[in-house]
Amino acid sequence: MIVYIEKQEIIWLQNFVTKYFPRPKVDEIIRKVIPEEDFIKYYKNAKNSEMSKGAGFVTKAEDYAIPNSSNELIESLRLDYSGTKFSKDKGFVVIEYKNPSPNVEHPFNTSQSTNRLPYTNTGMTGSKHNIIPEYHSSDIVKFDVDDVVRVYDKNGKIIESYKIVEDNITKEKIWKKQ
């Protein structure tokens, strides 16, 4: 069942979110969730240590616990949008990194404000079970030392973990399996 709310109610919710859920500060730990296949294609098998984390929707790490399964992740973060690569039958990847940018915004203050459902335009996910503040980064940011990537199977178990470290000899930033 889809419930529609009035424009004034959305504005009230946006003001509430702006006041009580401030944008991530520089150096605050944020999370980006990506499909496992994207991690393999763009990160794990890439030889370019300067590969970007990309832009898009992110959350503060402190705002939620990693879900116990792909199914729970999809529901909690509302990753069930049209064309999604996320599936209850596949694993997922969580990238945790220090926010390098002062430009992470509430999504209703960005071009994302016209997205279709399940996007709510309130700054919160639209899950039936929980509400998680969400933000949008339009900056393409690079991986840096101490950024962490964890690969989860469909049951929410960590199967691989990586950290960016600086090579002592070449001084290049490299993935190191933990």
Where in this protein do the model-derived segments appear?
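Catalytic toxin/effector domains delivered as secreted proteins or via bacterial secretion systems
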Residues: 10-178
